[in-house]
From Swiss-Prot:
Family: Belongs to the AccD/PCCB family.
Reaction(s) catalysed (UniProt annotation): N(6)-carboxybiotinyl-L-lysyl-[protein] + acetyl-CoA = N(6)-biotinyl-L-lysyl-[protein] + malonyl-CoA
PANTHER family associated with the record: ACETYL-COENZYME A CARBOXYLASE CARBOXYL TRANSFERASE SUBUNIT BETA, CHLOROPLASTIC
Domain CoA carboxyltransferase N-terminal intervals: 37-307
Name of the protein in question: Acetyl-coenzyme A carboxylase carboxyl transferase subunit beta
NCBIfam families with a match to the protein in the record: accD (TIGR00515)
UniProt entry tagged with the keyword Zinc-finger: yes
Cofactor note: Binds 1 zinc ion per subunit.
EC annotation from Swiss-Prot or TrEMBL: 2.1.3.15
GO cellular component: acetyl-CoA carboxylase complex
Cofactor: Zn(2+)
Length: 314
């Protein structure tokens, strides 16, 4: 729905009687009508009706820009209705180092927990996708930039071990700035712990699909995010270890290549397997999961590329 269409529809539904109101009252009423109803795309500046954007899973209908979505929204988009069974909901971070930066770590945790209604930066559990049982983990960037502390690492590890034990495929969505500095070495050790659990999952012959979303950096990239048997990414996702500004300042050799660290750049250079738009992700994941279930292979539709690769960028 365009802006002009919305105003035309609004005029049909109701008429605002502003006669006799002061200019301040008129401004307040117009602002109350407009606030939250429209979102401006940071990529193309197009205004999109918020409900239309939500129905399109936060993907700009004008240019395809992928806005960030929350972990609960991701689960709602992907899993069969009513199939989600959360795991390890009781796990919550502590402050063993009594860390203090601009404010105490414990106070910072409480603030993010209240703001996001999450205990930490990942949701893990079991569900089904097009009837196929799956173990799934989804990171939420709203919680301290999706940073990986001891709870995130523990939940990812337990999820992986559960998938290995129950012979389930594993799908993890990454969105993170890296390891959580407030937990020091306890955070860094999660890289080795999650990687070891995934190695056991692989040795058991089970599938792991890693989906990279914007942004995925640091210790998450250096551990489980890049260990998938299949590595997918959303269009435009920024993925790396250190950020481009840090790299430029460190190497001191001018500008980095255009598009460096984007999903498109990684695909062109063989670091990921496919770029899948969010609106097609459920269908594509279902196809990939079914390919690893022999009884379902015969009924699969043809698997076609979902994202064109520009040969000039290779």
């Amino acid at each position: 729905m365009s802006l002009l269409d919305w105003f035309a529809e609004r005029r049909k539904q109701t008429s605002l009687n502003l006669t006799g109101s002061s200019p301040f009252d008129k401004e307040r009423q117009v602002r109350e009508i407009a606030d939250g109803l429209w979102q401006k795309c940071p990529a193309c500046d197009a205004l999109t009706y918020t409900k239309d954007l939500q129905q399109n899973w936060q993907v700009c209908p004008s240019c395809g820009y992928h806005h960030r979505i929350t972990a609960p929204q991701r689960l709602q988009q992907l899993l069969d209705p009513g199939s989600w069974q959360p795991l390890d909901e009781h796990l919550a971070p502590t402050d063993p180092l009594h860390f203090f930066d601009q404010k105490p770590y414990a106070e910072r945790l409480a603030s993010y927990q209240e703001r996001t209604q999450l205990k930490d930066a990942v949701l893990t559990g079991l569900g089904s996708l097009e009837g196929i049982p799956v173990a799934m983990g989804v990171m939420d960037f709203r919680f301290m930039g999706g940073s990986m502390g001891s709870v995130v690492g523990e939940k990812i590890t337990r999820l992986t071990e559960r998938a290995t034990r129950d012979h389930l495929p594993l799908v993890i969505f990454s969105a993170s700035g890296g390891a959580r500095m407030q937990e020091g070495i306890l955070s860094l050790m999660q890289m080795a712990k999650t990687a070891a659990a995934l190695q056991r999952h692989r040795e058991a012959g089970q599938l792991f699909i890693s989906v990279l979303t914007h942004p995925t950096y640091g210790g998450v990239t250096a551990s489980f995010a890049m260990l998938g048997d299949l590595i997918l990414a959303e269009p435009g996702a920024q993925v790396g270890f250190a950020g481009p500004n840090v790299i430029e300042q460190t190497i001191g050799k001018g500008k980095l290549p255009e598009g460096f660290q984007t999903a498109e750049y990684l695909l062109a250079h063989g670091l990921i397997d496919a770029i899948v738009p969010r609106t097609e992700l459920r269908r594509r994941l279902a196809q990939l999961l079914a390919m690893h279930r022999p009884r379902l292979r015969m009924s699969l539709p043809a698997l076609e590329p979902t994202y064109a690769l520009d040969p000039a960028r290779i």
